[in-house]
């Protein structure tokens, strides 16, 4: 899936780097998949707002992901109207950092880190939820990557 008239070179680089990353024994296939999916969303201009609270603009204590609102909330706004703890869920500071890193990093440096099991679980949840709420098409290259992950 790409927007019409969009330069697809970065997406092709992402696919290439992702396929190369699948050969690296120290990188889990699950992590490669989630990085690929989330970066693809970002390259298509559809990434959630992750660098400041979507309610107040605060840039610290960003611990609550709100898939419906396509962004992250600080601790204070999570507990206030209109959110009151609804629709958002807690993620660790490490997960927030990883999501920001995926969005902001150049494609060639995406696969230079690993994550803990806890961060991987949160990353799975965030990416799956975001896809369900905001992405209405199936990525053909994501399907190809899925097929490769089965082996």
Predicted regions and their residues:
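Non-catalytic alpha-helical scaffolds and adjoining flexible linkers that form interface surfaces
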Residues: 1-151
């Amino acid at each position: 899936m790409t927007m019409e008239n969009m330069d697809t070179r970065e997406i092709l680089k992402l696919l290439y780097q992702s396929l190369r990353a699948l050969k690296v024994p120290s990188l889990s296939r699950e992590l490669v998949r989630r990085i690929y999916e989330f970066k693809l969303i970002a390259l298509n201009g559809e990434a959630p707002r992750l660098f400041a609270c979507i309610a107040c603009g605060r840039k610290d204590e960003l611990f609550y992901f709100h898939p419906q609102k396509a962004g992250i909330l600080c601790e204070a706004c999570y507990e206030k109207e209109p959110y009151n703890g609804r629709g958002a869920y807690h993620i660790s500071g490490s997960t927030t950092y990883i999501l920001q890193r995926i969005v902001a990093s150049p494609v060639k440096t995406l696969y230079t880190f690993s994550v803990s099991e806890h961060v991987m679980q949160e990353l799975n949840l965030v990416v799956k939820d975001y896809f369900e709420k905001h992405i209405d098409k199936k990525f053909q290259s994501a399907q190809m990557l899925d097929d490769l992950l089965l082996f």
